[in-house]
Amino acid sequence: MLAVALQGIGGMNSFAAGVLQTLRNEGVKPDLISVTSGAILSAYYFLQKDSNAIEKYYDEYFKSEENGIPTFFKFMQYAYLGIPEKFSPNYLNIFERLPDNGPFSTLEEWINFYFPNKIYKSEFPQQFFDDIANFFSTNEEVGIIMNAYNVNNDQAVLYVNERALDTMELNKSEHFEVKPITPDGVRACLQLLQYGDFKGEYDGAYQYNPVLSPLVVADEIILVTVAPLGKSLDPIDNIFDIEDFKLKMLFKNALYAELNDISRINKLIEYGNKLVRPESANKPYKEYKPIKVQTIQPTIHRGFFEYFVETREFYQDGVFQAKKFMDDNLNK
């Protein structure tokens, strides 16, 4: 059984897209997919009947973006003016925010108005969430899991389709709750911190990027990251490097913990221990087996000013690294 786990966030999503397009071209068909944040869209195109859906989407995107404007200035443009049908800055919605902050009788109300927790307003059309939810929830061939974060109970929320529910390690625990994939679920999984919460939930990338533990039923996991693992970041010389550092650590810390858990399972089995999963109503307990984890990761560091900007270079790095991955595995 093969599982694919995809990290995702902002302008770094194009790497996973390049990887997925290459895997599709090579005929790789995962049984399970764990996907976080913006990589949800790449997975959506990856599973379409059109085998070139990802490439077509990004080709159109890059044509519209390659206008000679340097990345730094694009970042500033998007940060201050937003991106049509994606998000708009909340300072442009000042009159809409007035009723939520009045009557301005306390200092806190003034502070909340001038320094809101909702920096941006999501502008994705409802059809966007409907299409993804319907496509994922009705997929009978691939188990799909997306994750959000519930800020009220400090738990991961796993949105899954029926195939995932029947296959993955999804016994309810104190660490996460399991829900069926719905349009609201897709929205929650894409709810950036800067938008404010959606029904108490945020984008899952702030907690797990991606979720790996339910994939331990697989024989092999292909992990696709948005930043190089096991490599140092660029030197921290200024405040923007500090923001870059915090962003990368957000992606890495929980991931390292989950990889260590899988390594611990493998070590215990190697040392002769018999490990079994708890028995449930629809799944008799099964013995754990060694889990092979392979990583496809970028060779390019992307930083704070690339947060909103996807590039063809990063997409092509995904294509190249996936081809290298396939060649290395074929030659073993």
Language-model features, listed with the residues they occupy:
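Patatin-like phospholipase
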Residues: 1-33, 44-332
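Transmembrane-helix signature of multi-pass solute transporters
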Residues: 40-42
